[in-house]
Every structure is written in structure tokens, then in C-alpha cells.
UniProtKB/Swiss-Prot annotation:
This is Protein translocase subunit SecA. One of its GO terms (cellular component) is plasma membrane-derived thylakoid membrane. It catalyses: ATP + H2O + cellular proteinSide 1 = ADP + phosphate + cellular proteinSide 2. CDD domains: DEXDc_SecA, SF2_C_secA. Part of the Sec protein translocase complex. Interacts with the SecYEG preprotein conducting channel. Has a central role in coupling the hydrolysis of ATP to the transfer of proteins into and across the cell membrane, serving as an ATP-driven molecular motor driving the stepwise translocation of polypeptide chains across the membrane. Probably participates in protein translocation into and across both the cytoplasmic and thylakoid membranes in cyanobacterial cells. The keyword Transcription does not apply. Keywords: ATP-binding, Cell inner membrane, Cell membrane, Cytoplasm, Membrane, Nucleotide-binding, Protein transport, Thylakoid, Translocase, Translocation, Transport. The lineage of its organism: Bacteria, Bacillati, Cyanobacteriota, Cyanophyceae, Acaryochloridales. Its EC number is 7.4.2.8. It is an enzyme of class 7 (translocase). It is a peripheral membrane protein. Monomer and homodimer. Part of the essential Sec protein translocation apparatus which comprises SecA, SecYEG and auxiliary proteins SecDF. Other proteins may also be involved. It holds the Pfam family SecA_SW. It is found in: Cell inner membrane; Cellular thylakoid membrane; Cytoplasm.
């Protein structure tokens, strides 16, 4: 009703951008006639106009027209009008919802260029290193062509490289790298070690994945703490001996376990202790973690065991996350369960959530194919509006209604049969599964039916081939099984991705000749042997024996055709030229990848080697496209890509992402979900009602049912889960907001010290406040002066400032409390000047160095302890909800007290340390006769 009266709010939003779109299109003819040099000169002209008082909004139409023209020349891609709209939405600091295949990556070039003109830096953020690298290489060409510098942050980079890349106009990187660099910068001990500039503007690709899916996971930098390994092993034995229902209950929804009274008795009996909560010998924490590890953390679902280590699997992307560990002893409990080496527990040194990290930017924007379902959360927490950008071509995807089976076994058989039917007609199929284990169940069923397929999951032997598999997933009769759709970012193009194949072919010849062998190459990961031609995507044990040598050989079936003799001889010639210029096996892998990336770009280059490689790349591309375009038409005729979902995800948004793989850019396609009553979503959130229906209808195991009631039950279950998780994220945000204010205060203080701002004045201020604290501790203004404890006051002052050893109680006996404070402040200033001249006799700037050292040392040490205290406080206030108190209000007020105590301790410790500081002269090295 309201929509009819007021009109669609989304359309109203888009309407206000329309005049700018018209203006950009009118400017197109003007910029088309400019030479490359003149187009590049526009960048300096825009910067000059900004200096002279014009705003970014004033420049928007012209800058967008210039970027569009540069993109046409360099990439051969012209921004559609809807992409211009997307760019304006991003420039306004909003979220642009754009469907898969609508060119989100190209859209980001528009606001990135415009905002980079200020010189304050722009961050383009993606979810993994591979995508960051791809975008920096691919879209970076446009920016480089226009004279802007482009940086890239990768996990393996040194601090010097990071600093150089952050100093660029536009920097591509992942959310986690940006976050960890922010934390590391705030732990550095000199300003030279700081790599980031102040956070200005950022565009996040897959913004829902970063700001919502990852919002519950804080980024943590930690140090190691010794803990007894035996406790984890004993607790694991206890967990195995205890029985569910009888000794403990599992709350899957809250991912928690609760011991029953019998459970407590049994656990205490096995361990031979009288109380699990005994503060002298606490066991409860270990036992709870061991039961969680047994019941809630499943091998091949939540983690995999690789090289005798527990490696976490990201529940949203299905990717492994090496190096990440669960905190609070949980990781150790899982190590004990799997009988691998138990590593030391860690102590948090610095932490931040993505929610608060991205709110540090002056302006934030993002793009995704699916944001509308989470619009309320984006607006409430991040103050980000969501605007839907219309598609360039109408959507032809057909979403077939879900089918539900009674048992999981029947569901998997039905999925395998559906794959067989589609394979028969030659349609490509993408099957989304929710765990490594389930993808392998389906793989076995397909092998029994002799259906060749590719497996894409967190297993190491499949990860290496991720983008290669996705790039081919749209070819005729291809069957791809993907866990949680890892590989987001590589488009599934019907008929196959010719550009990617041409790059693979050139790499296959070039890389073995110019890349250093593995043991000389510190940056490369452990490599995986690729399967031989004709295999089903299983690479044996995924390891090569002997010395780790990377294999660049690609399975021949990846390519649509063998390259012509001419192309092959040109390719060998180009590779020889590269070897001649760079040397045989002499480049680190990252550098070689850069060379390969530039060779497959269109940006102008004077390098003869790159020109040769580019010439042969384009020739191979042409040969491949002749095949892929025919195959594209064939696949379109047969109905396009068919996407099969095998379980509804907790969130409708993730389901929509999987569906969005089919029917990109107006192509045909279809999607269907196959479900069972044993699926987690139905089991945990509302399966009883559905099971009741099934039993009432006496449905056979293998008989599918499709019904409106079922579909609405599922939708309701998903809404319940979404609300549940939103509440958790909101709570995380509200609690972290308290920490965030403290973090900002402490990091701002730290940065001022690092930059060496007024160090002496700061320490004198600390010393004066410490004198005030001492007076307030020993002088009670409500008592008569003769009862004031002046002897102790003087002793305490001397304890802090030994240079005031001549101070007597009689010197202050006749003073009022404010006069006493003034007197001691003056004394401490004189003492500090005396201390400074003593220290500086040894080296003129030594006192400033000492000030910086002691302040940073105390801030870091006490902040670490403070983080632990705040964690303990958060757990403690959680219990107060039972006593009718609001835990959040309690946490805020007590957290503030704890913070003030820490700030006081920092001041006092710094003053004490500096007055105690007595530098020693280094003895001169004696001359050897």
C-alpha cells in the first residue's frame, strides 16, 4: 500500500543519480578524441582543481567519463550505465547490491579513482589474497594508465614492501591483512615501523561476507603462554567417557555444552578431584572444552587435520585458514581429541573486530550480490544504506522449488540422479555442499555412475586448482562439486573462460623456466601435485616426494583445443626471450606472477619481453575463443548452468549467492535445492513440525515432497537463525564498542608517543598527576592537618623520585592540600630537569629515547593485562543478568573503572622507571696486543 502511494524508495534513490549518468554519456565523445597522453594529463588537472576548492562531487561526471574511456582503451571494457550508477552509490558511502556477473570489480574503478585524487589513499578490499592480486593486476591497469600508483598487500610481504604499497594512491588487499597491519602498527616501537597511513576511504567487495559473516570473529595478535599439556589429554579422556543426555546436554543452537549433576560427579570421579571449579586446581574449563571438541567440532567440517596440525575450515567459504587458531584452549582440546601435538595456549596482545576496524575509515562503501536481506544490520551498525542496482540484461534464471526427503541418504541419491540427467543432456552442473565430508559422499556416488567431475573443497590437493576449476565450470557437461562455494570471484562463463585458459597455457611454459626452485623461494607455499589427465580431481595424497618442486603442468583436458604449431613456436620464442633477460630459474614466484599478469593485460608497455609474451597470449586467446564461443552457444541452447543446493544455509543470503552463479548477464540457467529432514537447519530450527507432516502423510524414505507449507517452514527457520545470529553480532558489537573507545584512546596516546610529540611535557604531566595521587592517598581534607600522615606521604614520594631525598615532612607541614600539590609538582619538575641533564651527559638525546621506550613498554604490557581483565569482566557480568542487572551497563561502568586504573598504572610506572633509569657506559673494547 505504502509502496504504491510513495513509490519504490530504491527507484527514488536511483533517480537522483540519473542527471549525472546523462552528463557522463554526453562527455563520452569529448574524451574519446583525447590522445593517451591527454587522457593521462586529466589526473593532474583534477588534482589541481581539487586544490583550488572544487569538491569530489563537482568532479564526478568528468572523472567517471575519463575512467570509462581509459577502461575501454586498456581493458576493452566499457562501463554500462548501471555500472556508472553503482560507482556513484559507492562514492556516496553506500552498499551497492549488484547481481553476479554484472561487473562489480569494474564498477569499483570509478569511485577508487575519484577518491584517490585527494592523495589520502583508497583501499580496495577483497576476501582473499588471490582476488586482491587479480584485481590489482586487472583493474590496476586502468589506474596505472591514468598515472595513479597501485599497491597490493599479500600475506607473504615484508614490512618495507607493505609500507611502500600502502603509500600508493590505491591499495588492494584482504580484510584480514588490513586488520592485522592496523594492529601491528599499534604495537610498533618506532614510527618507521608503521606501515599504514590514516584510513581514508575503502570499497569492500563481497561486503556481506566481511561485515556480517566475519563480524563475530575478532582479529587477534597473540603471544604464547605455557599451559600443562596433560590437562588437555586427561580432559579429552573424560569427555570420551561421558555420555550425551546422561552426563551432559549439547545445545547446538548456542554451540554450547552443559554438564548434568551426574556429569559433574562422574568427571570428578574420573579425575580424582573433589571440585572441578577448585581455584587451586581448576578443571571445569578443560572438561567443557573437551566435550565441545567432541560434540560440536567435527573433522572435515569445522577443521581438517593436515601435517599433524589442526587447520580451521572457514564455515562460509569452505576454505582452510592456516595459521588461525581457536582461542581459550579450544584449539588445544581439539588437538588432544585428534591426538596430534598440543601447541601452547596464547595470550591476546592486540585485538579488534571487523565491525570496529571498518568504522575507522572516514568513508566506507561496499558491493555484493546479496545485501538486501541484511539491510537493517548494515544501517544499524555501520550506518550504510543499501541500494539495489538494476541488472544490465533481464534475468532469465529459473528457480525450481525445493524438494525434501525423509533421509539424508535418499537426498544424496536424488542429487546424484539429477547430476546424471543433466550430464546426459550436456548441461554444466554446479553442486554446492556444506562440508568436505559431504562433497566426498557425492563424489563417490558420481564415480559409481561414471560421471567425471571436479571437487572443490578445503582439502589441500584441491585448493591449488580452485580458480582453474571454477573457470571451467561452465563448459559442456562439466560437473563441479564446491564446498560453500569457495572460489567466489572467478566468474563461471558458459563455454569456459578463454582468457583464464590462455593465461594458464603461457604460465605452463614460462614459469618452470624463470621461477626459482622451491627451496630458494621463501615466499612459496607447500605445493600440490595436480591430477593427471582424465582423473576426477583427486590428486593422490596431494604431496610430491623428495624436494618440493612446483609443478606448473596443467591437465590437458582444461584446454578446449591444442594450440597451433605457429602459436607454440612463438610461445617458446617468447619464453626464451624472458629467460635471456631474467636468467634461468632466477625470479621469486611473486615477481614471475607479476610478469605474467602484465603480459596478459592491455596496458601500454615498452618492455620487449612483455610485448612478445603479450603477442603470443593474444594469439592463443583467439584460438581458444573460437572454440569457447561455439561451446557457449551450445550450452545456452541446452539451458545454461544448473545449480544444485544440497542443504539450506543458516542464512538466505548464502543460498542466494549460490543461486546467483546461474543465469549471469542474461544467460539462461536454473537452480534447485535438495533437502532432507536430517539437515542441520531443519533439525535444529523446526524440523519436528515438518517430520510430523511427513509421518502424517506416511511418506516413503525416497519419495520427495514439494509443498508450500514446507517452503514457508524453511523460510521461517532461516529467519529465526538470521535473527539469532544478528542478535549475537549486535551483542559482540555493543560489547566491543566499549573496548573500541578504550582502544582508540590508548592507540592515539601510543601514536603521539611514537611520533615523539612533546615527550618531556607528557612525562612531566604524568609525574605531576602521580604527585597529586600521592597527596590524595595520604591526606584526608576532612581530618585536621595534625592527623595527616605526612611521614608516609614523603616516604612514598621519595620511593618514586629518589632525587627528592632531602624532602622532609616539615617542608610541607604548614601547607594546605592544594598548596601541597603545587609544591610537590614544582619539586618533581626540578628533579626531572636534574635527571635529564644527568642522563644526557652520556648521550644528548638519550632521555627522549628513554621516555619513548618506557611509555611504550608500559602501555603495551598493561594493555595486554587489561585485555585479559576485560575478558574476565565480560564473562563475570554475563551471570549478573540472572540478578536483574543489565550486563552491558555493568560492563560499561566497571570497564571504565578498570581502564582508568590502567591509565593511572601506566603513568606511575613510567615515572618510577624513568627516575630509576641509570644508563651505564659501555666499556671500550680493549685493544688486542
Amino acid at each position: 500500500m505504502l509502496k504504491t502511494l510513495l513509490g519504490d524508495p530504491n527507484k527514488r534513490k536511483l533517480k537522483k543519480y540519473q542527471p549525472d549518468v546523462v552528463e557522463i554519456n554526453l562527455l563520452e565523445e569529448e574524451v574519446e578524441v583525447l590522445s593517451d597522453q591527454e587522457l593521462r594529463a586529466k589526473t593532474d588537472e583534477f588534482k589541481e582543481r581539487l586544490k583550488n576548492g572544487e569538491t569530489l562531487d563537482d568532479l564526478l561526471p568528468e572523472t567517471f567519463a575519463v575512467v570509462r574511456e581509459a577502461s575501454k582503451r586498456v581493458l576493452g571494457m566499457r562501463h554500462f550505465d548501471v555500472q556508472l550508477l553503482g560507482g556513484m552509490i559507492l562514492h556516496d558511502g553506500q552498499i551497492a547490491e549488484m547481481k553476479t556477473g554484472e561487473g562489480k570489480t569494474l564498477v569499483s574503478t570509478l569511485p577508487a579513482y575519484l577518491n584517490a585524487l585527494t592523495g589520502k589513499g583508497v583501499h580496495a578490499i577483497t576476501v582473499n589474497d588471490y582476488l586482491a592480486r587479480r584485481d590489482a593486476e586487472w583493474m590496476g591497469q586502468v589506474h596505472r594508465f591514468l598515472g595513479l600508483s597501485v599497491g597490493l598487500i599479500q600475506q607473504s610481504m615484508s614490512p618495507t614492501e607493505r609500507k611502500k604499497n600502502y603509500a600508493c594512491d590505491i591499495t588492494y588487499g584482504t580484510n584480514s591483512e588490513i586488520g592485522f597491519d592496523y594492529l601491528r602498527d599499534n604495537m610498533s616501537t618506532s614510527i618507521e615501523e608503521v606501515v599504514q597511513r590514516p584510513l581514508n576511504y575503502c570499497v569492500i567487495d563481497e561486503v556481506d561476507s566481511v561485515l556480517i559473516d566475519e563480524a563475530r570473529t575478532p582479529l587477534i595478535i597473540s603471544g604464547q603462554v605455557e599451559r600443562p599439556t596433560e590437562k588437555y589429554l586427561d580432559a579429552s579422556k573424560v569427555a570420551n567417557a561421558l555420555q550425551p543426555e546422561e552426563h551432559y546436554e549439547v545445545d547446538e543452537k548456542a554451540r554450547n555444552v552443559i554438564l548434568t549433576d551426574e556429569g559433574f560427579v562422574e568427571a570428578e570421579k574420573i579425575l580424582g578431584v573433589s571440585d572441578l571449579f577448585d581455584p587451586e586446581d581448576p578443571w571445569a574449563h578443560y572438561v567443557f572444552n573437551a566435550i565441545k571438541a567432541k560434540e560440536l567440532f567435527i573433522n572435515d567440517v569445522n577443521y581438517i587435520v593436515r601435517n599433524d596440525e589442526i587447520v580451521i575450515v572457514d564455515e562460509f567459504t569452505g576454505r582452510v585458514m592456516p595459521g588461525r587458531r581457536w582461542s581459550d584452549g579450544l584449539h588445544q582440546a581439539i588437538e588432544a581429541k585428534e591426538k596430534v601435538e598440543i601447541q601452547n595456549e596464547t595470550q591476546t596482545l592486540a585485538t579488534i573486530t571487523y565491525q570496529n576496524l571498518f568504522l575507522l575509515y572516514d568513508k566506507l562503501a561496499g558491493m555484493t550480490g546479496t545485501a538486501k536481506t541484511e539491510e537493517a544490520e548494515f544501517e544499524k551498525i555501520y550506518k550504510l544504506e543499501v541500494t539495489i542496482v538494476p541488472t544490465n540484461r533481464s534475468n532469465q534464471r529459473q528457480d525450481i522449488s525445493d524438494v525434501v526427503y525423509k533421509s539424508e541418504e535418499a537426498k544424496w541419491l536424488a542429487v546424484a540422479n539429477e547430476c546424471a540427467d543433466m550430464y546426459e543432456v550436456g548441461r554444466p552442473i554446479l553442486v554446492g555442499t556444506t562440508s568436505v565430508e559431504k562433497s566426498e559422499v557425492l563424489s563417490k556416488l558420481l564415480l559409481e555412475r561414471n560421471i567425471p567431475h571436479n571437487l572443490l573443497n578445503a582439502k589441500p590437493e584441491n585448493v591449488e586448482r580452485e580458480s582453474e576449476i571454477v573457470a571451467q565450470a561452465g563448459r559442456e557437461g562439466r560437473v563441479t562439486i564446491a564446498t560453500n562455494m569457495a572460489g567466489r570471484g572467478t566468474d563461471i562463463i558458459l563455454g569456459g573462460n578463454a582468457e583464464y585458459m590462455a593465461r594458464l597455457k603461457v604460465r605452463e611454459y614460462l614459469m618452470p623456466r624463470i621461477v626459482q626452485p622451491e627451496d630458494d623461494n621463501p615466499l612459496s607455499m607447500m605445493q600440490v601435485k595436480l591430477p593427471e589427465a582424465g582423473s576426477q580431481g583427486f590428486g593422490g595424497d596431494g604431496q610430491q616426494k623428495g624436494m618440493q618442486r612446483k609443478t606448473w603442468k596443467v591437465s590437458p583436458e582444461i584446454f578446449p583445443t591444442t594450440i597451433s604449431k605457429d602459436a607454440e613456436s612463438l610461445l617458446k620464442e617468447a619464453v626464451n626471450a624472458a629467460v635471456k633477460q631474467y636468467g634461468e630459474q632466477s625470479l621469486p614466484e611473486l615477481q614471475a606472477e607479476d610478469l605474467m599478469a602484465v603480459a596478459s593485460e592491455k596496458a601500454p608497455t615498452d618492455d620487449p619481453v612483455i610485448q612478445k609474451l603479450r603477442e603470443v597470449y593474444n594469439l592463443i586467446l583467439e584460438e581458444y575463443e573460437a572454440f569457447t564461443s561455439k561451446e557457449h552457444d551450445k550450452v545456452v541452447e541446452r539451458g545454461g548452468l544448473h545449480v544444485i543446493g544440497t542443504e539450506r544455509h543458516d542464512s538466505r543470503r548464502i543460498d542466494n549467492q549460490l543461486r546467483g552463479r546461474a543465469g549471469r548477464q542474461g544467460d539462461p540457467g536454473s537452480t534447485r535445492f535438495f533437502l532432507s529432514l536430517q539437515d542441520n537447519l531443519l533439525r535444529i530450527f523446526g524440523g519436528d513440525r515438518v517430520a510430523g507432516l511427513m509421518n502424517a502423510f506416511r511418506v516413503e524414505e525416497d519419495m520427495p515432497i514439494e509443498s508450500r507449507i514446507l517452503t514457508s517452514s524453511l523460510e521461517n527457520a532461516q529467519k529465526k537463525v538470521e535473527t539469532y545470529y544478528y542478535d549475537i553480532r549486535k551483542q559482540v558489537f555493543e560489547y566491543d564498542e566499549v573496548m573500541n573507545n578504550q582502544r582508540r584512546a590508548i592507540y592515539a596516546e601510543r601514536r603521539r608517543v611514537l611520533e615523539g610529540e612533546d615527550l618531556k611535557e607528557r612525562v612531566i604531566e604524568y609525574a605531576e598527576q602521580t604527585m597529586d595521587d600521592i597527596v590524595e592517598a595520604y591526606v584526608n581534607p576532612e581530618l585536621p592537618p595534625e592527623e595527616w600522615n605526612l611521614e608516609q606521604l614523603v616516604d612514598k614520594t621519595k620511593e618514586f623520585v629518589y632525587l627528592l631525598e632531602d624532602l622532609e615532612a616539615s617542608h610541607i607541614a604548614d601547607l594546605s592540600m592544594p598548596e601541597m600539590k603545587m609544591f610537590l609538582r614544582e619539586q618533581v619538575r626540578i628533579a626531572y630537569d636534574q635527571k635529564e641533564s644527568e642522563v644526557n651527559e652520556m648521550e644528548p638525546t638519550l632521555m627522549r629515547q628513554a621516555e619513548r621506550f618506557f611509555i611504550l613498554q608500559q602501555i603495551d604490557m598493561l594493555w595486554r593485562e587489561h585485555l585479559q581483565q576485560m575478558d574476565a569482566l565480560r564473562e563475570a557480568v554475563g551471570l549478573r543478568g540472572y540478578g536483574q542487572q543489565d550486563p552491558l551497563i555493568e560492563y560499561k561502568s566497571e570497564g571504565y573503572e578498570v581502564f582508568l586504573d590502567m591509565m593511572t598504572a601506566i603513568r606511575r610506572n613510567v615515572v618510577y622507571s624513568l627516575f630509576q633509569f641509570r644508563p651505564q657506559r659501555q666499556p671500550e673494547p680493549s685493544e688486542v696486543a
